[in-house]
Amino acid sequence: MAVTSHHMVPVFVLMSACLATAGPEPSTRCELSPISASHPVQALMESFTVLSGCASRGTTGLPREVHILNLRSTDQGLGQPQREVTLHLNPIASVHTHHKPVVFLLNSPQPLVWHVKTERLAAGVPRLFLVSEGSVVQFSSGNFSLTAETEERSFPQENEHLLHWAQKEYGAVTSFTELKIARNIYIKVGEDQVFPPTCNIGKNFLSLNYLAEYLQPKAAEGCVLASQPHEKEVHIIELISPNSNPYSTFQVDIIIDIRPAREDPEVVKNLVLILKCKKSVNWVIKSFDVKGNLKVIAPDSIGFGKESERSMTVTKLVRNDYPSTQENLMKWALDNGYSPVTSYTIAPVANRFHLRLENNEEMRDEEVHTIPPELRILLGPDHLPALDSPPFQGEIPNGGFPFPFPDIPRRGWKEGEDRIPRPKEPIIPRVQLLPDHREPEEVQGGVNIALSVKCDNEKMVVAVDKDSFQTNGYSGMELTLLDPSCKAKMNGTHFVLESPLNGCGTRHRRSAPDGVVYYNSIVVQAPSPGDSSGWPDGYEDLESGDNGFPGDTDEGETAPLSRAGVVVFNCSLRQLRSPSGFQDQLDGNATFNMELYNTDLFLVPSPGVFSVAENEHVYVEVSVTKADQDLGFAIQTCFISPYSNPDRMSDYTIIENICPKDDSVKFYSSKRVHFPIPHAEVDKKRFSFVFKSVFNTSLLFLHCELTLCSRNKGSQKLPKCVTPDDACTSLDATMIWTMMQNKKTFTKPLAVVLQVDYKENVPNMKESSPVPPPPQIFHGLDTLTVMGIAFAAFVIGALLTGALWYIYSHTGETARRQQVPTSPPASENSSAAHSIGSTQSTPCSSSSTA
């Protein structure tokens, strides 16, 4: 025993040493309990609905549109009544930019503050907001508020009275919507010719153009494993179903909303989200007022919000090796280096999650990510250092390159003009780095690359300091613009990239009535020709937290950059002359539309969801309304997918790069329609295909991408229009790239109707219903076939009768020897008696003789 105890002492000492050196190991034990308000992740159900309403095209011939919102009080007992409403205004799908004056009647049971947010509504157009007494309207855009007026009115409260009041005042009403007070109301302005001529209020008014958003908290369970906030946090969110319908196959977006738990101080995090759902969903990540790095891991598709909804530098990683249980998922996170796990949340039903982050007080102020000094050139003149050397010709004071650079030739300028005005609304691009090759899943926070941008009315030139580029470990990397063919040139000190204003992937938007902001990006990637991804791990890609492009940016648009680091830059110019050689993306004077029809007559489009069965024809008509007669369009791609997101491609391709891929595709000729408006015309393209049910789901989506082209001569902005036959043989990569810059995607839902087997579902056809028999039972036989069958049956019957008579006549002698009748019955047929008598003459004489 003494020996045993003597050897046990070192064992205990060794165990104690191991525990002491290991430190506090992150716990993977999670005791699930219902979450409270203090839990960092909250589950919610977002719904969109209205009480009643209507829409019409009655204001088409009038000088203004009229939209009415009649708000009702919410249920009492839910706390303080709501005092603020955000009104989101966008054009309808068939209108790219809305230019018509509008009157909004905003009636509410209590005074409200209306926050108006607009997208693609032209500036300088008069708009009138009539509000209830005590309500005010606030505008987020300064240009929009210059021509917007607000007046207080006393409105009738009942729907019909309010509608009649507006019709009497303005002649007609474009839309009327009754809804409960909500935080967010979404109204799409514009007039569609498919609307009825008058507005008749209905209870079951459902339209994607007029909706209110409601958020309802949902029950969830979870645990918090780290009580104190850290610089790095890992949150695991598991969702059972995005809706309460267990049979729904519609892929929905699950929104993760990330914000600080308190307004200040500023929150800086290295955040990891591990997302899991048993059904196929699309995770949409939105971050507000949180700086740092965000990594999202999920087995499904991952998207991100608009540029204004991306405050963090984000990385996404698709992993399909998730374990099934909660304990194993926690262990999986630790085994893959995602530790310590901060929280775990599981929700039975939800379509939105709010993640609220606490500030890490231990982080020092100098660790807050700021814009590098080299990029202050993009902030504006107040942030720029003074140059030691005088500016060269045409250069902005304090805004030129930090190295000698030859003058850029400029055409169309007069001597002494202000050649490059300062941008009125400078935009700060967010900068990203390539991941470290040793740790490809990490994204670095700051960047020290000297970047200078210069532009004139012909081109943009961006220069990257070679020393700062190589100092940060990017030696041997390749620099291009968004168009990979636009590569950097080198001089002694800098990489120089040059782009015309209408090429190399450059986009633009109007920042003021006389200003244009041009955007492009520097793509940093390995020049290896054998590996198209450039990543050690092919699934991970990097997206800019704010790419500077207007509108939504989806996965399809960022896919070409998913393998590279991206540095976004921009330049603002005053539009001295009408730009030649380019037009707004999907020209503002061109409006696209797509409709589905049941027949090849293309008379009445199918409203709502289009019903289709196996082997049935689907007739598609796409059109463009335009003013330029030389402007044409093409159907670039059409495919059917079980997903509503057009960026998720499928194998069921109908048309690809204008060339038909489905053998059943048939094109139809159509005439060009001229409008009474001067120089306005409508071009149409029609085609059909035979639907094949290749997906095991009842709801599918037809996605078609349309692109502009030039009828006469192709340019760098627009390719020359080609026929489908030519596209199948002569389309090259340059034309495809140009088409992608001017595409517009339309989506139409398809309801798959299954063919019913009558024998299985209707066992007794006569008793259950008078439905006629299934069509395969002689339903399609013509008259000649039926007569042939009847004649054949008659011949067969005659032959059978003759055969029976032959058998009977040859067996009659034996039967009569057994029994000879003395006289025929009186009831026998005379012909039968005559026949029998004639056959018995000889036997009778023989019998009498015997």
Curated annotation (Swiss-Prot):
Keyword Heme: no
Compositionally biased region (Low complexity): 835-850
SMART domains assigned: ZP (SM00241)
Domain called ZP: residue spans: 454-728
Keyword annotations of the record: Cell membrane, Disulfide bond, Extracellular matrix, Glycoprotein, Membrane, Phosphoprotein, Proteoglycan, Receptor, Secreted, Signal, Transmembrane, Transmembrane helix
Pfam families: Zona_pellucida, ZP-N
Ranges facing Extracellular side: 23-785
Disulphide-bonded residues: 54-199, 638-704, 659-728, 709-721
GO cellular component assignments: cell surface; cytoplasm; endoplasmic reticulum; extracellular region; plasma membrane
Annotated function: Cell surface receptor that regulates diverse cellular processes including cell proliferation, differentiation, migration, and apoptosis. Initiates BMP, inhibin, and TGF-beta signaling pathways by interacting with different ligands including TGFB1, BMP2, BMP5, BMP7 or GDF5. Alternatively, acts as a cell surface coreceptor for BMP ligands, serving to enhance ligand binding by differentially regulating BMPR1A/ALK3 and BMPR1B/ALK6 receptor trafficking. Promotes epithelial cell adhesion, focal adhesion formation and integrin signaling during epithelial cell spreading on fibronectin.
Protein name as annotated: Transforming growth factor beta receptor type 3
Organism for this UniProt entry: Mus musculus (Mouse)
Taxonomic placement: Eukaryota, Metazoa, Chordata, Craniata, Vertebrata
